[in-house]
Amino acid sequence: IVSMANYYEAVGNKDAAETQIRNALVNEKLDVDTKVGILSRYILKLQQTKKGTESANALFLTLLEQHPEDIDLKQMYGSLLVAQGKTDEARFQFQLITEMEPSNAAAWQQLLNLALKSEDIPEVIRICTRCQELFPDAPEYYFYLGIAYFQQEKYQDALDTYKAGLEIIPETNVGLKSDFYGQIGDIYYQIKNMLEAYKAYDEALKYNDKNVVVLNNYAYFLSLEKKDLKKAERMSALAVKLEPNNSTYLDTYAWIFFVQGNYTLAKIYIES
């Protein structure tokens, strides 16, 4: 069946190709797993030949009509819709999955990815809050919830979220610990609590001394206060070494030289 469908697709007869697949999908003698396998191979062939996969959508709908409760089928269709850029339709499929099977972490993650991509902050908060209940040991939901609160300027909520998240992150996960402390530092700086901000940044660098975002932000904020400029220079230099083509980090490095009165080096890094 797939071979015939691929043949018709190759000669440009999409209608005949879809008919072959549809005939298989409505065949009562085939179980759902076999049908999903046939459809998966057909989609893979479309992708390999750089052809549009939209022709598979109607086939998915045909199969979903027969098996409306099949979670894996909805997951596959949702992923295909994401690849096609059909955000709203994909979100609908993943939302259905989370309603049918609330413990389906993959569907929640897809929903979160779509909400982040579309910058739908209320939806990010809804998803993360629910997932904190469902997956209490998953720190990623604390991380993105904190970002969402920060963007809403709910700084205390963001702080509380990150501090709670720190409690569930294993000490061995030094990268994530560092990122959380970095976010805490940014929040404290935003509310003008410099002392706590710098404490948080120091803690972040204890866990990961190459956290490039923290290195840059910490250095820049120190330079704005004209405080500990040599420390700021060292951190900024490391950030530039780690990401030499990052224009933001180069600008910070140049600015620190400028603040110290080293205008020659400042000019070199500004121009680079």
Regions found by a protein language model. Give the residues of each.
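Alpha-solenoid helical repeat scaffolds
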Residues: 1-272
